[in-house]
């Protein structure tokens, strides 16, 4: 059974930055994530979407951001367990400061002084079209629920369903890549950002995008691979066949907290309540950082999660080293920190 200072649930940006802050203080970490890759929603849902609000980095894609964080934590000792979910937490009170026994869905067990919940919005899965039986039979055969690579749609006839931010964002983003785009929504009104909707409607005026409202999907066309879809006018009930190479269903996500909701910690608005000094939950030794937590003034931004986990790691150090002062130094001038980072002899 492996013993660590911090067990981190979630390998997204905030979970990765936790490894960095912990490494500066000499704390050992392990990361657990139920996805099959590191990066959380950034890698799974929008790897090629740009991020503009990371301090000092004017523009980078979500995947570039994840890659930069992985590069940043290379000097530190940590392990990653993917395709696993934390199933059970059991407090171990045999020492002055208790530890946590953590068991995963694969049966792996860990003892950790602190547990950081950095699970973003929890586990998530895309919403399927409600009227279609088994749309996943065409998964990776023309149907997708997110954009992993923009190049996949180059010179393709693309059909996008949805009326929120993702549908509008990708309609605008892919307009210069796809051969043609038809955006289908069941209402004339959209739920996305007004500025993006304006951009989309400008593309409609120029003929780069065809807008079909109010329409809903009625059926899929194809045998081995997707060949198109049948859509129905919501008002007239008339149907129409649309031929296409690719379909993007962008109806949003179903979010689930999973076992986190059963751990007996205080919740608010389906998020984990924390204090704003240590970002500790109502249970000692359990911390929540990033989009999973809630407190007055909370903003669901990556940079806020970085701030939260930086302070939380200070308390994790105290738990692993009772009675010791938390060391503090600037990476620009502290030779011990620079040695840990591998930037000095």
List the predicted regions and their residue ranges.
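FAD-site-proximal beta/loop scaffold in flavoenzymes
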Residues: 133-152, 246, 250-304, 311
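Rossmann-like NAD(P)H-binding beta-loop-alpha module
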Residues: 23, 36, 154-177
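Glycine-rich FAD pyrophosphate-binding loop
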Residues: 23-44, 181-190
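Glycine-rich Rossmann-fold phosphate-binding loop(s) that bind the pyrophosphate
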Residues: 10-14, 162-164
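A conserved FAD-binding loop/helix module that cradles the flavin
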Residues: 168-170, 292-336
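A Rossmann-like FAD-binding core segment of flavoenzymes
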Residues: 70-104, 109-112, 123, 175-276, ...
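Conserved N-terminal glycine-rich FAD pyrophosphate-binding loop of Rossmann-like flavoproteins
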Residues: 36-60, 193-198
